[in-house]
Regions:
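Paired acidic/hydrophobic, glycine-rich loop segments that form the ligand-binding mouth/hinge
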Residues: 75-78, 165-169, 185
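Short beta-strand->loop
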Residues: 89-92, 145, 181-192
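Central regulatory/effector-binding core of bacterial HTH transcription factors
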Residues: 25-88, 231-235
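Secondary-structure junction motif
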Residues: 119-140
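Alpha-helical "hinge/linker" immediately C-terminal to small N-terminal DNA-binding modules
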Residues: 1-21
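C-terminal effector-binding regulatory domain of bacterial HTH transcription factors
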Residues: 17, 50, 54, 171-180, ...
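Short beta-strand-to-loop elements that line the ligand-binding cleft
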Residues: 56-61, 125, 143-152, 190
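Flexible hinge/capping segments at coil-to-helix
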Residues: 86-97, 101-124
Length: 237
């Protein structure tokens, strides 16, 4: 339940904060941008700042792949497959990708019932022209096309809401548009979930306590956000 989630978060935060009032120094983090950054990373690091007033926090919200070691970051938050970089990769959370379109788009273009039918639709792309779905427990990669290619979740959401095509992105990026009827979820049986967000940090013998505490807070916020996502998904299915 949402009450249990809130209680668990409070317990986790009190645990990481109780003995840590003397933390100090600088915390430097590189984070992916987008809905996860806005809904989880930013609030978690603001919580860190509120709990530990002697810690200076610098967060770089950026899509580029930083060099953690040479650029002096304590850790990075990244999505997608992890390359073997000599860094420690720690899974942070899973994400479920959801396909959706506006009622107007579906009325004009029809509603695809299988991912293979997306070849006949305008898909709003980001980075890749392949979308990954799951069919009966197996991965299904589908080539898609579209005249919009956007690397901003907000821009994708706006274009989708205006009937310009089908969006397929992490459920957190849709905000309230799925529950309030602005957008209609489609291909519900094929949505793909992967453990795609990781914390990357240097492989050091000694990790400063402020870094360990920041990661603990981040994990608590990510767990709460994921639990809310699962509730939202269940309500849509």
């Amino acid at each position: 339940s949402s009450e249990k989630i809130a209680d668990d978060l409070d317990a986790a935060l009190s645990e990481v904060s109780s003995a840590q009032h003397n933390l100090e120094g600088r915390l430097r983090v590189a984070s992916l941008s987008g809905s996860f950054a806005d809904q989880v990373v930013g609030p978690a690091m603001n919580e860190m700042a509120a709990l530990h007033p002697n810690v200076e926090i610098v967060i770089d919200f950026n899509a580029r792949q930083v060099d953690i070691l040479s650029e002096g970051y304590d850790f990075a938050i990244r999505a997608g497959p992890m390359q073997d970089s000599g860094l420690i990769a720690r899974p942070l959370t899973s994400r479920t990708r959801v396909a959706a379109a506006s009622p107007e788009y579906l009325a004009s273009n029809g509603k695809p019932l299988h991912p293979a039918e997306l070849k006949d639709h305008q898909c709003i792309l980001t980075h890749s022209n392949k979308w990954r779905f799951t069919e009966k427990g197996k991965l299904l990669d589908v080539a898609v096309t579209g005249r919009l290619n956007l690397n901003s979740g907000q821009a994708i959401l706006d274009g989708c809401s205006r009937g310009l095509g089908i969006a397929y992105m992490a459920i957190g990026g849709f905000g309230k548009t799925l529950s309030d009827g602005t957008l209609t979820p489609i291909l519900n049986d094929f949505w793909h979930t992967d453990r795609s967000i990781h914390i990357l940090r240097p492989d050091r013998r000694y990790t400063p306590r402020r870094v360990e505490v920041a990661i603990s807070i981040l994990e608590a916020f990510a767990e709460r956000a994921r639990a809310h996502e699962i509730q939202t998904i269940r309500a849509l299915l």
